[in-house]
Amino acid sequence: DRWAPLDALTLDAWLGRIAGEALLAGRINARQAPRLALSVFQERMLWARAIDADAAQDSDLFDREGLAVAVAAASDLAEVWSLPLPKDGGDGGNGGDVSEELRSFLRWRRHFHADCEHNGWLEPARLRAWQLRAIEAGACRLPARVSFAGFDRYTPQEHALMRALAARGVEVEELPLGRESAGAATLAGFPDRQAECRAAAAWAAGRL
């Protein structure tokens, strides 16, 4: 029998695959899907445009590209960790305690979201939220089991994904990496490279 490779993907790649399959199968209305999933570079360019468009700031005083990278990272964290933010650049009922930096961020974020909404774009963090809603709606075809591996901690967005998968009947598990104790090393000699390759293949097959 031919060995089947492990279907291991990053979270974003897997979500993109199952949502893309649902779109092609017609289980997701194309009109409800984003026209474009922004790449990291495209997202940063859009943030830079939002910063430039802010009449309250003199963008010539900033490292625009560096600021766009920092603002994109901050917005991503706010999305995936479900951080509460004041709306519309106000103080959120905090009596004016919001810093000028946060007010600027909120203005840029509002401009960024308006630009995305007008053009039908989504940056990675909100794209994941859209894909999660597609899973919850039953639009995506799911495997019987999904294993999470390599996460040192889970964001609220990832916990929501786990709950959505479990609600759809998927077995969700966490795959531990590494070993509880060090393995034992064994030294072996072989007459030539071909024999060594055959032995390595047999060793790997015995552990699959």
Model-derived regions: residue spans:
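Conserved beta-strand scaffold positions in the cores of enzyme catalytic domains, especially
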Residues: A8, V172-E174, A184-L187
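Short, solvent-exposed loop/turn segments at secondary-structure junctions
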Residues: W14, D152-Y154, R193
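Carbohydrate-active enzymes and regulators
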Residues: T10, W47, A149, A200, ...
